[in-house]
Structure formats: structure tokens, C-alpha cells
């Protein structure tokens, strides 16, 4: 009896895929204490130029003035809201122009990749925009509800597991993933009232109280999302 007709080195491929996932560092410090925005502020304090994709950090980085450039697909200016016109109007998934290559010490894309139609192309653009040794900061959802507006001024395309995010960041030298929330707190967070009414009142301790009821609560795979920091090689390309 003959086996299946082999058309690919499937064992070698699976070994390479496993290696990509396993090389990502896992840090649980923000599992029940989401201080990721403070993390970004501290890590970019000395950056010469920062690209904030979608403007998700505009409220925290305003003191840096002209060192921060924002980019968005939509030209929105709404007085009284946290929205303002971007410095650069463009598509995260289409090739960035040459003048943007190597321009930034940090690229920030918080809660953005789920809204783009080609996250692999977007991450490649972010990497190209970074100077050697530059850092990419991401937040992506995993266990989270659909959240595009009815107007579809932006869309909701993707969710990212630990393995999927590690694969997206495979071309960076160093990758650290920070799970946000655990198994049960991620489920609770699916309710629209959980974060504004419960988390904001009790803080991260309420999520910890929910999650520690299982022996494997310090896990990296059942999360509402992931904050990630990825470092580009210092070698010139």
C-alpha cells in the first residue's frame, strides 16, 4: 500500500512555522493591568520621529509636537472629539513612497490591523518605514466582537491569535507579545457594558478575580487581544 503523493516538504514547513511561534517572547505583565499606552510613551520618549497609524496615540504624544506624524485612510476632522486630520492621507496596505522608508524610529498601530484588508502588506510597510533598530508597537484583537460602524467608514476584517501575530512579525529581529485579559475576562469583555461599567470601576483586579479560577490562567493563547513590540534589525538593508 502506497502513501499519499507528496507535493511539499510538509514536515519541514511545520517545523519552520512552529519555530516562528516559539521565538516570540511572551510577557504577562499586562494580562490584568493594561498599561500598554504608558509603555509606548516611555519607549518612544527619545524617538526622533514617530509614525502613529490611525492616530491612536495622539492624546498621549501631543507633547512631542512635530516629532509625531499621523497617517489615516480617512480625512476626518471633528471638533470636540479625539479625531483630527492626519498629517498623511494614505492606505496602510499599499506600498509607502520612498521618502517614508527608514524615516521613523517608531511606528505605532494600535487597534488598526483588524481594520485593514491586507495585514501582511501593512506590516511590511511599517517595517520599511522604520529606521534600523526602530520599533513597531501594535495592539490587535483576538477574542473580540465585530466593531465597524454602520457607515463602514472603516471596516472590520481580521482577528489575530498568538500564532498569527508571531507569523506577521516574523521578519523582525525581536518580538514580544503581551496578552491582554485571560480566558474568562476576555469573554466578559465581549459584553459592551463590561469595560465602561465594570473594568473602569474595579480596575484589572476584577479580571484577575475571574481568570485565576482555572489552574492554567497564566496562558498566552486565550486573550481578548495582544499588545506587541517588534524590533527591526540594526543592519542596513
Per-segment meaning from a language model:
Residues 1-106, 110, 223-226, 233-237:
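Conserved N-terminal segment of class I S-adenosyl-L-methionine
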Residues 66-70, 86-87, 124-129, 154-156:
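Glycine-rich, phosphate-binding/catalytic loops in enzymes
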Residues 110-113, 139:
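Residues lining the SAM
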Residues 117-127, 135-237:
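S-adenosyl-L-methionine-dependent methyltransferase catalytic module, highlighting the catalytic core
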Amino acid at each position: 500500500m502506497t502513501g499519499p503523493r507528496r507535493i511539499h516538504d510538509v514536515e519541514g514547513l511545520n517545523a519552520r512555522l512552529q519555530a516562528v511561534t516559539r521565538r516570540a517572547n511572551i510577557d504577562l505583565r499586562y494580562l490584568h493591568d493594561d498599561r500598554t499606552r504608558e509603555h509606548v510613551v516611555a519607549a518612544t520618549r527619545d524617538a526622533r520621529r514617530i509614525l502613529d497609524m490611525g492616530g491612536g496615540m495622539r492624546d498621549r504624544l501631543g507633547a512631542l509636537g512635530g516629532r509625531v506624524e499621523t497617517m489615516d485612510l480617512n480625512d476626518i476632522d471633528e471638533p470636540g472629539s479625539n479625531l483630527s486630520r492626519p498629517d498623511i492621507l494614505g492606505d496602510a496596505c499599499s506600498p509607502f513612497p520612498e521618502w517614508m522608508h527608514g524615516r521613523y524610529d517608531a511606528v505605532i498601530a494600535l487597534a488598526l490591523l483588524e481594520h485593514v484588508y491586507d495585514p501582511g502588506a501593512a506590516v511590511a510597510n511599517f517595517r520599511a518605514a522604520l529606521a534600523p533598530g526602530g520599533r513597531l508597537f501594535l495592539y490587535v484583537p483576538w477574542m473580540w466582537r465585530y466593531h465597524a460602524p454602520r457607515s463602514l467608514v472603516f471596516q472590520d476584517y481580521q482577528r489575530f491569535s498568538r500564532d498569527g501575530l508571531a507569523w506577521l512579525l516574523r521578519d523582525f529581529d525581536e518580538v514580544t507579545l503581551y496578552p491582554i485579559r485571560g480566558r474568562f475576562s476576555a469573554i466578559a469583555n465581549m459584553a459592551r457594558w463590561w469595560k465602561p461599567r465594570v473594568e473602569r470601576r474595579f480596575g484589572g483586579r476584577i479580571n484577575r478575580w475571574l481568570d485565576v479560577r482555572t489552574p492554567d490562567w497564566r496562558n498566552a493563547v486565550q486573550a481578548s487581544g495582544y499588545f506587541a513590540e517588534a524590533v527591526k534589525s540594526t543592519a542596513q538593508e
